[in-house]
Amino acid sequence: MNDLAFLSGLLSELKLAVPWGHIAAKAWGSLKGAPVLCLHGWLDNANSFDRLIPLLPQDFYYVAMDFGGHGLSSHYSPGLPYYHQDFVNEIRRVAAALKWNRFSLMGHSFGGAVGGMFSCVFPEMVDKLLLLDSVPLVLESSEVENVLTYRRRAMEHILQLEASNKPSNVVSPEEMLQGLLKNNSQVGEECGKLLLQRGTTQVATGLVLNRDRRIAWPELGFDFISRELFKKALQKLQARVLHVKASQGFTSVRKETKGNKDTIHFMIDTLQMILKERYQFVEVPGNHYVHMNDPHQVAKIISTFLLSDGAPAPGLPTTA
């Protein structure tokens, strides 16, 4: 399908000032509509939502932001790492810049985990939380033994980058696309091109990646929490939650094991137990990027949820 058809309704590109530069974002819909902040996945960018948002009700105001160091947003100041709480803080800064006191969050993958933490830390600010093949918080589970290794690896990576002071690699558009598809097999070719439109800059001899090379290991970008803290955090949550799981999605990306399965089941059971009718779970066929590869698959589900009030949306199951 022609990408221009998907981009219909785009209102504007935004640049929101932050102490280290700016947060870039793009907006669709009605300025007078209820606001929805859209959060992309790890190493992706705001173009992650280009195919989905035009299929949603256009009387909302959708803003898809680039996290710091991603897309067209400024990189963090030299010497500083990117921690989970910093991305959570970016949501608060964007809300302040847009003068939003209450809004909904829609996050894919890593964006859902950042949005979930924000929704627990600032519960009064979030009306609805939509998780697209994501989890609201990340449990330590089998990763707990590796956390220190992850932190060391990430810190050493930053120090090596600073010491080498090498310029970014310049490659051809085709090489860039094939590199993306090799490292992320669940992104289709057309969607890969869409992400690279915002994720790269054209120079005389090819393309360079826009993202900050300090952002390398997703484990440093997550806050791993205990099951006890998971329960406590959910008790603070005021938002209604729509949890859309892809049948071949997040757990496949994370190399599904018995431990991971148990963790996912614990999360879903706990969400149902604590949030009750405020939690709705839907599984759809597709992979981790189903919202890009097959946006019609999830658009109706999301639209129904956004348009619904306090009661569970008709036609959306509330159990896994």
Predicted region positions:
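Active-site loop/oxyanion-hole signature of alpha/beta-hydrolase fold enzymes
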Residues: 6-8, 14-19, 64-106, 300
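Alpha/beta-hydrolase fold catalytic core
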Residues: 1-38, 57-61, 100-101, 136, ...
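A catalytic-pocket lid/entrance helix-loop region that shapes and gates access to the active site
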Residues: 132-169
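Conserved HGGG/HGGXW glycine-rich cap/lid loop of the alpha/beta-hydrolase fold
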Residues: 26-75
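Conserved hydrolase catalytic core segment
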Residues: 55, 61, 100-146
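Catalytic histidine-centered segment of alpha/beta-hydrolase-like enzymes
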Residues: 286-299
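Conserved alpha/beta-hydrolase catalytic His-Asp/Glu region
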Residues: 163-224
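Conserved serine/cysteine hydrolase catalytic core
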Residues: 199-275, 280-282
